[in-house]
Curated annotation (Swiss-Prot):
PANTHER family: CLEAVAGE AND POLYADENYLATION SPECIFICITY FACTOR SUBUNIT 4, CLEAVAGE AND POLYADENYLATION SPECIFICITY FACTOR SUBUNIT 4-RELATED. This is mRNA 3'-end-processing protein YTH1. The keyword Repeat applies. GO terms for cellular component: cytosol; mRNA cleavage and polyadenylation specificity factor complex. Belongs to the CPSF4/YTH1 family. It is found in: Nucleus. InterPro entries: CPSF4/Yth1, Znf_CCCH, Znf_CCCH_sf. The keyword Zinc applies. GO terms for biological process: mRNA processing. A zinc finger (C3H1-type) spans 29-60, 62-89, 90-118, 119-146, 148-171.
């Protein structure tokens, strides 16, 4: 009776099983070790066993990818041909759609998906990094406050901008090649009169006068 409920299929191999393993990765352990000889830049020829290698050949399209959401549920049918990772890596998990939409997650802290801070998606303000942003708090970009490097302010930082943990501000040097133009009083008064006439005309149109 036990042989009927739990049959031993290894005793009856089929001739087409090697073809299924080669083309569709059939009956291969998904947790099998990664082949150390395989180089995705060269291809299957880099491995002595080629396409018949019992170990996993990680292709180039799988490098630095996110985890397959279908694989997490056991529903992925692509096996090794899937363009997403088939491994549990918290840093490469897909983004939680519920958290991205609502700002909180009902499954937290047990949620398997990645919770990304919405502010991290906002690009930094170039004007603020230069030293001053005219929009202030109304700026749609992110103002990142950093501690100024005193060595850089004094004249030289041996670590440089990339290695130093503190801020190296950009100093904006105005273009002095073009001559400065000073407006005359007549131009200023003419502009004021035009603005006053425009306000008076709008008041007449709106029936305020």
């Amino acid at each position: 009776m036990g042989s009927v409920v739990h049959p031993d299929t290894e005793k009856y191999p089929f001739k087409f099983e090697p073809f299924l393993r080669q083309e569709y990765s059939f009956a291969l352990d998904p947790d099998r070790p990664v082949c150390e000889d395989f180089n995705y830049k060269i291809g299957p020829s880099s491995c002595p066993n080629g396409v018949f290698c019992p170990k996993k050949h990680v292709l180039g399209i799988f490098q630095n990818k996110i985890v397959c959401k279908h694989w997490l549920r056991g529903l992925c049918k692509k096996n090794d041909n899937c363009e997403y990772l088939h491994e549990y890596n918290l840093r490469k998990m897909p983004e939680c759609v519920f958290y991205a939409k609502n700002g909180f997650c009902t499954q937290s802290p047990e949620c398997q998906y990645l919770h990304i801070d919405p502010l991290s998606k906002v690009p930094p303000c170039e004007d603020y990094e230069m030293g001053f942003c005219p929009k202030g708090s109304a700026c749609e970009k992110r103002h990142i406050k950093k501690v100024l490097c005193q060595r850089y302010i004094n004249g030289f930082c041996p670590l440089g901008r990339r290695e130093c943990d503190m801020e190296h501000p950009f100093f904006y040097i105005p273009d002095l090649s073009s001559p400065l133009r000073i407006k005359k009083d007549e131009e200023i008064n003419t502009r004021k009169r035009d603005e006053e006439n425009e306000r008076r005309l709008n008041a007449i149109i709106n029936g305020e006068i």
